[in-house]
Amino acid sequence: MEHVLSTLSLEFFGKGKHKTTPEIFFAIENGFLLDVRAREEAESIAIKLDHHRNIECKNIPTDEIPDRIHEIPQDKSIAVCCSGMARSAIVYAYLLSKGFKNVCILEGGYATITDALKPGKILKVLQSK
């Protein structure tokens, strides 16, 4: 973890490489959306992205990440999301400390996902198939 912390400089945060938007992330070829909300949150409002075939979604609550880290693919671009960004930031740093390379935080959390899934944006996804 010390190595990860030592890389989090002003330049790192200033360039914004640690975060992405849903629009950018949903357009990549091979993505993995890691939902780190509590199980109860995910059961109440699930994130499925069934029409975004290039993105795999999985809910692994923050407190289960250490025991379930083997379920997170290292060969995909990973975006971590939660209802805000606090848990995402914690899991982001943890994954970096475990050697994951292609990890970022989904900027704005769940609210930006719902905005990115409005009817016009879903229609564009469907028409691009």
Predicted regions and their residues:
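Catalytic cysteine-centered active loop of the rhodanese-like fold, especially the PTP/DSP P-loop
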Residues: 58-116
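Flexible, polar/low-complexity N-terminal or interdomain linker segments that lie immediately upstream
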Residues: 1-53, 122-129
